[in-house]
């Protein structure tokens, strides 16, 4: 089931085609760890996360950010089945990693902020509304195992 209109899908896919996953991924995960420092506990193996500059310059943060945004790219290809797309990741984050599902919402909001910064005037209110709908859908799909 999908709550995305044709206009939503067009806005989401159009902007995503312009996203540099390497730049946006590291920036998004880095900002999540800086703005919401309690999320750092899930990344103990990443080395130094002792300051904003250490986090933003950490190659493991950047690499994992790319992995996260690559998964989001898959979601964009499957907007009508976000739950199915993220079923295995939901299971991993719930059963093995024990990540609070609220963190998925926070990550989505940080991503929207990063995309707004990177895409400036192209990131219109309509694009933002569609993107917010998408990250909310992804957060719900990732949190589905918790329900």
Swiss-Prot record:
PROSITE patterns: GLOBIN (PS01033). GO terms for biological process: hydrogen peroxide catabolic process. It comes from the Eukaryota. The modification S-nitrosocysteine is found at residue 94. Pfam families: Globin. Residues 3-147 form the Globin domain. The keyword Transport applies. The modification Phosphothreonine is found at residue 13. GO terms for cellular component: blood microparticle; haptoglobin-hemoglobin complex; hemoglobin complex. The keyword Iron applies. The modification Phosphoserine is found at residues 45, 51, 53, 140. Heterotetramer of two alpha chains and two gamma chains in fetal hemoglobin (Hb F). Gamma chains make up the fetal hemoglobin F, in combination with alpha chains. This is Hemoglobin subunit gamma-1. It comes from Plecturocebus moloch (Dusky titi monkey). The gene is HBG1.
């Amino acid at each position: 089931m999908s709550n995305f209109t044709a206009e939503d899908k067009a806005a989401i896919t159009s902007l995503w085609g312009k996203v540099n996953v390497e730049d946006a991924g590291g920036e998004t995960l880095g900002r999540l760890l800086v703005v919401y420092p309690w999320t750092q506990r899930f990344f103990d193996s990443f080395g130094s996360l002792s300051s904003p500059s250490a986090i933003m310059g950490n190659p493991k943060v950047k690499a994992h950010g790319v992995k996260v945004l690559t998964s989001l790219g898959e979601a964009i290809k499957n907007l009508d089945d976000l739950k199915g797309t993220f079923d295995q990741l939901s299971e991993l984050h719930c059963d093995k990693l024990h990540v609070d599902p609220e963190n998925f919402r926070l990550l989505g909001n940080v991503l929207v902020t990063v995309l707004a910064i990177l895409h400036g005037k192209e990131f219109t209110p309509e694009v933002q509304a569609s993107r917010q709908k998408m990250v909310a859908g992804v957060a719900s799909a990732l949190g589905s195992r918790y329900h």
